[in-house]
């Protein structure tokens, strides 16, 4: 299990020196990556995440996206990161005036549906 943890830390861009550091010595972004990694290593079947890409650099965002795409449980997230939402969600719940409306697909599909446009075909690029 120690090897699995070290490998996971490496995927989240932690150097061997950082792995040996105390948590209090890490930056805010590094502590955020540790917290995300801890969540992903636990045996959860539901993750609730509020703005999970905040404080992450591009490599860390890519790593998080890949981990969440491969995550076998359910994810409920709030995010203003449109790219992140396009990569990891397959359903959006919109709460407006006390009513929840479900939109199937990613963020781009949601925006297109709101504009009355059909979903994109595989490989098609959105101009929305």
What residue spans do the PLM features occupy?
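ABC ATP-binding cassette signature C-motif
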Residues: 1-128
């Amino acid at each position: 299990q120690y090897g699995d943890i070290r490998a996971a830390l490496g995927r989240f861009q932690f150097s061997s020196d950082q792995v040996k550091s105390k948590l209090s010595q890490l930056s805010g972004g590094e502590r955020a990556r540790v917290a995300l990694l801890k969540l992903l290593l636990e045996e959860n079947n539901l993750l609730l995440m509020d703005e999970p890409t905040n404080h992450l650099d591009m490599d860390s965002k890519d790593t998080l996206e890949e981990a969440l795409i491969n995550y076998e449980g359910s994810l409920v997230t709030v995010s203003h990161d449109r790219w992140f939402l396009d990569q990891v969600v397959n359903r959006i719940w919109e709460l407006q005036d006390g009513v929840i409306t479900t939109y199937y697909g990613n963020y781009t599909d949601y925006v297109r549906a709101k504009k009355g446009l059909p979903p994109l075909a595989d490989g098609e690029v959105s101009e929305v």
